[in-house]
């Protein structure tokens, strides 16, 4: 079973939490199951950037990203080359480390 290490966050997570994950589930699913209150304004439909996270380890073990996710990420605060939407990033077989940015933009697109 892969493990997800959520790194400390000033408001949401005072200390790191390591969680077990199932291959094939999203980072957001793991966070919510472990009571990490990661925002997700669009209810996991890839229409906002509130669940933006930065993958510090294991980026290439996650599923590939879609053009839609890439477009939404362009609007995320603090975008980095290892940024993903946690509702879209599907966990593979390797352990990952996730940083939750201090801020997010509640930018939503209606399709």
Swiss-Prot record:
User: GO MF terms on file?
Assistant: 2 iron, 2 sulfur cluster binding; electron transfer activity; metal ion binding
| Cross-referenced CDD domains | fer2
Tell me the organism. Answer: Buchnera aphidicola subsp. Acyrthosiphon pisum (strain APS) (Acyrthosiphon pisum symbiotic bacterium)
Coiled-coil region(s): none
What is the annotated role of this protein in its UniProt record?
Ferredoxin are iron-sulfur proteins that transfer electrons in a wide variety of metabolic reactions.
Mind telling me which SUPFAM superfamilies this protein's record contains? 2Fe-2S ferredoxin-like
Q: Where does [2Fe-2S] cluster bind?
A: 42, 48, 51, 87
Q: Which cofactor does it need?
A: [2Fe-2S] cluster
GO CC annotations on file: cytosol
Under the heading NCBIfam families, the entry gives: fdx_isc (TIGR02007)
According to its UniProt record, which protein family does this protein belong to? Belongs to the adrenodoxin/putidaredoxin family.
User: Which keywords annotate this record?
Assistant: 2Fe-2S, Electron transport, Iron, Iron-sulfur, Metal-binding, Transport
What is the protein's name according to its record?
A: 2Fe-2S ferredoxin
Domain 2Fe-2S ferredoxin-type residue range list: 1-104
What cystine pairs are annotated? none
GO BP term (any one)? P450-containing electron transport chain
Cofactor binding note from Swiss-Prot or TrEMBL: Binds 1 [2Fe-2S] cluster.
């Amino acid at each position: 079973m892969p493990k997800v290490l959520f790194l400390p966050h000033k408001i949401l997570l005072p200390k790191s939490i390591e969680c077990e994950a199932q291959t094939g589930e999203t980072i957001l699913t793991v966070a919510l199951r472990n009571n990490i209150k990661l925002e997700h304004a669009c209810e996991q439909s890839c229409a906002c950037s509130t669940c933006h996270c930065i993958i510090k380890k294991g980026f290439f073990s996650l599923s590939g990203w879609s053009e839609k996710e890439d477009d939404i990420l362009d609007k995320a605060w603090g975008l980095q080359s290892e940024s993903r939407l946690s509702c879209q990033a599907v966990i593979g077989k390797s352990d990952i480390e996730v940083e939750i940015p201090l801020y997010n933009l509640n930018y939503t697109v209606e399709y």
